[in-house]
Structure formats: structure tokens, C-alpha cells
């Protein structure tokens, strides 16, 4: 099996012995140049130009948690093409990041940092902080990251609701790095809403956590009307994709006090422009798309790819295989 690896990290991966690996750069041009007529598997984050031929290609593995770069792409839509992604690899760090931002908000860590800078010692009751326990969090997108977030929050006494395509409590069939992570049977949410009932779910949520893929249907999922449906002073945490939020509508909702705060780790476009109003807004906390960055990312990528190569050669379903209908947009 001939595999083209477009990856800037280590390439000393222990893959099945009959897999012949060629490496190339991560740019679309480098990928197009690296694809040979007999390349069967492309492991990448970006995709080559739409007019790329690659006649032997039969499987694209995306090294990202999402798959928006493959939606509508001719190679991904080719008959018989299999597409998978790296969803779940970063579930642990991303879930911890979400919980960290929630604690940061409720426990007023930023306020305490400002007090330290000003060498101010206030009265204890003046800075009393409420518990996280008993708050309600709405997880929008109940995949690997969403389920691991639910597991951590439930252990802390947070009431979790979830948004997914259907209201069935579905078993998770994707990849997770360690046993016991996530919510395998989908039993943790107190309530599950379909996307069509987003407004209803938003009305009672203290925290709205975005972990859903960006698709044409979910672009600007949080917009003027949906932001207006949120519980007053609720907090948004976005670790998925920047395009899920209409930034102009978000600023308006923050300015009016409808939304209490937004913790944004993702933006559209990236990097965030230096003149973006998001940087300086007092009710927005910006982090540079770091929630899923971890030192052992290459090890996790290798482990998932190795398992899927074995599955592919055995004719079995791939972990994190994306249904063709989702790639049509």
C-alpha cells in the first residue's frame, strides 16, 4: 500500500510493514506534487487543488478533528473514496481546556490576577465566588470532545445537555486514546436536543460549549437570533471552528449584555487579524487555537493511523470514517 504523508512533525512512525510511506510538505501545491498515480492513501490536513487527478487514491485520512476542508472537494466526493479524520485524538486536552475556562470564569481568576497586579487585598466576601456545581452546560456537538467534556463536567456536578443530529442516545464508535474516556453509551446528558431545537436548549444554559464540526449547515450556528435566545449573561466557549459564530452578531450581543462572556480559541480566518475588534473586547478572551495542542500529538496520530491501516487492509470500517453524505455539504 502506497501512502503519502503530508505532515510537518516526526515521520518515524511504526506502520504495518507493507505500507510504503512517502513524505511531502503540507501545502496544497506540495501535496499535489507528491501524489503519484499509484498513491492509495493520503494522510494530510490540507487537500490538494480540486483539479488534482490521483487516479489510485482510495482513502484520505485528515489529521484534524473536523472535516470542513473535505466538504465538496472533488477527491473526497469521488465514488468509492473513503475519508476519515482524527476526531478524538485531542479529546482529553480540549475537554480540560473547556473545564479550565469555565473554572476561570466562575472562580474569577482574571480578577484575582488584576488584584495581585494592583497589590490589592479586598474583603473576602467582596470576592466570593459561586460553585460550578449545579450550573447547566449545553454541549453543541456530542462527539469525542463533547463526550469527554461531559464526563469531566458531570463529575464536578454540572448538569449537561447536548445537541446532536438526533435525540437517540447513541453509542460512540469513534476513536479515543484511552479506555474510560468520554461517554461511550451517550447516557450522561440530562437532555438531548436535535439541532432544530437549538433555541430551546440555549434558553436554560449557563455555558454554551461548541464542539460541533463546521459544515454549510452549522456555519454561523450562533447568529443574531440564536444569540438572542440564550439565557441572559450566559458564557460561550468555542473550541471547534471560528465559522460557527457570526462574530459581528456576537460583539453586538456582548455589548448589549445579552451574552456574558465569550472564550474563543478558534477564529475565521486564522491567525486572527491584528486589527480585529475581538482582541480588545472586554468580554472576549482570545486564545490562539491551542486547546488541542499537546506534546504527544504525533504519537496519537500514529496510533490512530496504524489502527485504521489494519482495518483498511482487512476490509473493516475505519475509525472516524465520515459518511459520504456529510461530505456533500
Locate each region found by the language model:
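N-terminal glycine-/charge-rich "phosphate-binding" loop or analogous flexible N-terminal tail
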Residues: 1-41, 171, 177-178, 329
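Phosphate/diphosphate ligand-binding glycine-rich loop within oxidoreductases
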Residues: 37-116, 129-130
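Short, well-ordered coil/turn residues at beta-beta hairpins
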Residues: 45, 63, 211-214, 239, ...
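Phosphate-coordination loops involved in phosphoryl transfer and adenosine-cofactor binding
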Residues: 80, 133-136, 233
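Oxidoreductase and adenylate-handling cofactor-binding alpha/beta cores
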Residues: 95-114, 154-158, 303-316
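Glycine-rich NAD(P)-binding loop of Rossmann-like domains
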Residues: 113-148, 188
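Rossmann-like adenosine-cofactor binding region
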Residues: 167-277
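Rossmann-like dinucleotide-binding domain for NAD(H)/NADP(H)
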Residues: 233, 239-329
